[in-house]
Amino acid sequence: MAYVIGVDIGTQSTKALLVGPDGELIARHSQAYRVDTPRPGWAEQWPQVWLDAVYACVAACTAAAKLDPGQIKALCVSSLYGGSGIPVNEAIEPLHPCLIWMDRRAEAQVTHIQAEQDLARLQAITGNGVDSYYGFTKMLWLKQERPDIWRQTRWLLPPNSYVNHALTGEVAIDHSSAGNIGGVYDIVARAWSEPMLSALGIDARLMPARLLHADEVVGGLLPGPAARLGLAPGTAVLAGGVDAAMATLAAGVSRPGKHVAMIGTSMCWGYLDRQADARHGLVSFPHVYGGDRQLYSFGGALTAGASVSWFREQFGLAEGELPSAAGEDPHMALERLAAQVAAGSEGLLFLPYLMGERSPVWDAKASASFIGLGLQHGKAHLYRAVLEGVTYALRHNIEAGREAVGDLDRQLTVVGGASHSDLWMQIIADVTGFEVLTIAQEVEAAYGAALLAAHSAGLLSPAQWENGWVQLRHRASPNPALRERYDTLFDAYRQCYPALKSIFHQLRNARDE
């Protein structure tokens, strides 16, 4: 029997899955790590952390499965969006931490680009806009703020490309990662844009010349890495791609109209389309399957699950506050109490902008806020307001997407850590009006990487590929009685950012003085 391995390098952990040809999970392993945040608005990671985690997770899977290494036919790596990419020298040695997707330090570069470049031309070529989220702005920060590093840089590699080189010795980049850089990638030609590289002052030689679709083979596994991983030398290593698109693939999205919200540290709500229009404020790049003809377009909140984690860590229930039997998990107790709070949190709103915001706001200086606080509000109200606030951000992106794509299926699939919460799934149904489905297997992007590996290795029938491996289960239906209330609150949510924008900017500028 033949098997494959899917890996997902995430922001806070790496996961590996060893999967059989029918999608059965044979082994799984994960390894956690932290993001370095040396200054407000900065977020970076050294790539060795990712590579060590990949080795550890895959080796743990192969050791647990005890298979003949020759039975494992392919490996595919999905990864977080690596922003700037990893600046490496000719020997592929990292010169500086990778400025990841949530890093917002390139605001001066954004301001300069907006003043000096033809933005309509940039949007038409790349299908994307200008914001410090995009990798090309972070590249310019490295060029201008770390000139010694820039002079030594031979390539700028996304996380999966760096790992793939360590495994195969080959330098390549997948189209989804290249397109997500924005600014320098021609989304129609599916190639680097020489005119935009020249206009922005980024040397084309820094971009890997070998562009592959996610399901194409980068190379065979080298003997050294093979021994560390418990795999056979020569095992096919696929190009892989961006995690949000991989999670969408895992969820069985294979046609326009279907849509998925991946809610982990951040939130990415996405769908498939044939063309991109940056005017709607969404991010677009070639999909991880059929990327020569299909685009993955998404909108997302920077700090979705991160807002929930932040609240739990800073304001969660202490042991003495637990109102039930001893031994109840404080997080579960908080969830239970929040479920008893009326929809709308008694007039309390939360703006989930803990590190600025991505689409469709696109403002690195936006700040998180509780609005409407009163003496009647307790921790349970605030916690529910956080869940609702992230969900309003989801709806905000869905409405922007509707302007671009039109009709959407009445079912929304949710993947990621948020899917563990029954309360949150119900809030999503009530706020968006969609039937909410989740994946029974709870494996997301790594499962998508494994599915892609199995397809590339010829292990799937057409029906298996069309329908995917996942088993979807219904989680929540919208409550019609709450529709008007949530529509009113969402309208108030939409008004908050424009009303507070100037104050957000004043506070941010005062902080940075």
Regions found by a protein language model. Give the residues of each.
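Glycine/GP-enriched mid-protein hinge/lid loop-to-helix segment characteristic of carbohydrate kinases
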Residues: 23, 96-122, 277
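Short, acidic/turn-prone active-site loops that include or flank metal/cofactor-
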Residues: 31, 99-106, 265-267, 440-444
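Residue-level signal for inorganic ion chemistry
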Residues: 23, 46, 75, 103, ...
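Pocket-flanking alpha-helical
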Residues: 87, 108-112, 247-249
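N-terminal glycine/serine-rich phosphate-binding loop of ATP-dependent small-molecule kinases
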Residues: 1-96, 124, 152, 226-227, ...
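A conserved helix-loop-beta module that forms one wall/lid of the active-site cleft
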Residues: 201-213
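Short beta-strand-loop/turn "lid" adjacent to the catalytic site in phosphate-handling enzymes
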Residues: 63-101, 129-133, 164-186, 210-215
